[in-house]
């Protein structure tokens, strides 16, 4: 599927009404986070675990390339026609929050080609701790950080860390190598998030991303019960 492009218009901040998912529509889960946090690897892991039990597709966002979509295709996590890409230009957060038109068009194309979809995973381009998805684009969102940035990242907060539906602290196996204290990260995540869930994971240790997979399955169960 050819990439969709975000046109070069001014980056105004526009509020869209929260998407109201209709019965029979696929659940849309956003996966966001900084560059290198492991978003694409997490998306790949979820696809491998879910592809035999439901109908799903993936939409990636990259600034100037289709690198993340190409990675998913090379690793054959889904058939090629179930993986689409948006090229966002200079501001990756704009395409998922402010001007979501290119993403909505790509989602429409995926649904037109696969009218049985249960789930669409929408991966953002790599951005910073302020990037979040528009509620007009996704139903729920996962925000991925990793321990390589140090154990201070959760207490820095930011919309993604604080308000995402699920926070994932990835690459916990690297903690000893970078001097990160996982208990500090756990404590600080709990402090900034309150009752919102978070998980510490390592795809090197648990390639299925079991806690995240369980959370996604629960979101699907709730959505399909409506």
Curated annotation (Swiss-Prot):
- Gene Ontology annotations for the cellular component aspect, listed alphabetically: cytoplasm
Q: Would the keyword Chaperone be found if you checked this record's keyword annotation?
A: yes
Where in this chain does the entry annotate a coiled-coil region? none
Q: What is its main location?
A: cytoplasm
Pfam annotation, one family: cobW
| Region feature (Disordered) | 1-26
| InterPro entries, alphabetized | CobW/HypB/UreG_nucleotide-bd, P-loop_NTPase, UreG
GO BP annotation list = urea catabolic process
Among the GO molecular function terms of this UniProt record, one is: GTP binding
Subcellular localization(s) per the UniProt record: Cytoplasm
Does the record bear Nucleotide-binding in its keywords?
yes
Give the record's keywords alphabetically.
Chaperone, Cytoplasm, GTP-binding, Nickel insertion, Nucleotide-binding
Residue numbers binding GTP: 33-40
Query: Quaternary structure?
Result: Homodimer. UreD, UreF and UreG form a complex that acts as a GTP-hydrolysis-dependent molecular chaperone, activating the urease apoprotein by helping to assemble the nickel containing metallocenter of UreC. The UreE protein probably delivers the nickel.
Q: Which NCBIfam families match?
A: ureG
Q: What does this protein do?
A: Facilitates the functional incorporation of the urease nickel metallocenter. This process requires GTP hydrolysis, probably effectuated by UreG.
State the family it belongs to.
Answer: Belongs to the SIMIBI class G3E GTPase family. UreG subfamily.
Report what the protein is called. Urease accessory protein UreG
The organism is Mycolicibacterium vanbaalenii (strain DSM 7251 / JCM 13017 / BCRC 16820 / KCTC 9966 / NRRL B-24157 / PYR-1)
Q: What is the lineage of its organism?
A: Bacteria, Bacillati, Actinomycetota, Actinomycetes, Mycobacteriales
**What gene, per UniProt, encodes this protein?**
ureG
